[in-house]
Swiss-Prot record:
It comes from Lactobacillus helveticus (strain DPC 4571). Belongs to the peptidase S24 family. It comes from the Bacteria. Its EC number is 3.4.21.88. The gene is lexA. Homodimer. The keyword Cell inner membrane does not apply. This is LexA repressor. The record marks A93, G94 as: Cleavage. Pfam families: LexA_DNA_bind (PF01726), Peptidase_S24 (PF00717). HAMAP family: LexA (MF_00015). The active site is at S129, K167. The keyword Nucleus does not apply.
């Protein structure tokens, strides 16, 4: 196979992997790739996958049978723009502040969260009330939109004064407790609370 044909076949494989993950949420097997791109030998497919990995277009996990992840470079090669999630302002992790719903910018979506892309947003933390949970002042949290939570989960919640805060959630006998992860701070006790979402990720890099 000529280099041009080999490169074309590798892009065909890359496209098939992307489409399969996008459609069903997990990568194809090597035999599925064989059938899709009309190659009879699994060893030939393994060779193409190895070359895609060397080019930085694909990441393979040798400990798992079908753990294939297309890199941002790989998506660029396919002409696919990385998915992004909205950054919708600032939320307090100390004293609650008014929630900001305006979209300030967008942040590249981590590959492991792509299946939830439409349900995610990012907020910047101000304050130190969650430091014992490893959430520091200036961190960026990724939040999955949902209106329920289990006890002990870290949520973004609206208080009865229409303010947003990041705290650990507890539903108790006759009230809700929004518990800070800082031994010097008291919990917020509320008769009612509205949950905006659950914290599912954390980024410490500056996104500005």
């Amino acid at each position: 196979m000529s280099k041009k044909n080999s490169d074309t076949k590798q892009l065909e494989i890359l496209r098939y992997i992307y489409d399969t993950v996008d459609h069903r949420g997990f990568p194809p097997t090597v035999r599925e790739i064989c059938a899709a791109v009309k190659l009879s030998s699994t060893s030939t497919v393994h060779g193409h996958l190895a070359r895609l990995e060397r080019k930085g277009l694909l990441i393979k996990d040798a400990t798992k049978p079908r753990a294939l992840e297309i890199t941002d470079e790989g998506k660029k090669e396919l002409g696919i723009k990385p998915k992004r999630i909205p950054v919708i302002g600032v939320v307090a992790a100390g004293h609650p502040i008014l929630a900001v719903q305006d979209i300030d910018e967008y942040f590249p979506l981590p590959p492991d969260l792509e299946n939830d892309a439409g349900e995610l947003f990012m907020l910047k933390i101000h304050g130190e009330s969650m430091i014992n949970a490893g959430i520091l002042n200036g961190d960026n949290v990724i939040v999955k939109k949902q209106n329920t939570a289990n006890n002990g989960e870290i949520v973004v919640a609206m208080t009865d004064e229409n303010e947003a805060t990041v705290k650990r959630f507890y539903k108790e006998k006759d009230h809700y407790r929004l518990q800070p992860e800082n031994d010097t701070m008291a919990p917020i006790i509320l008769p009612e609370v509205t949950i905006l979402g659950k914290v599912v990720g954390l980024y410490r890099n500056n996104i500005d």
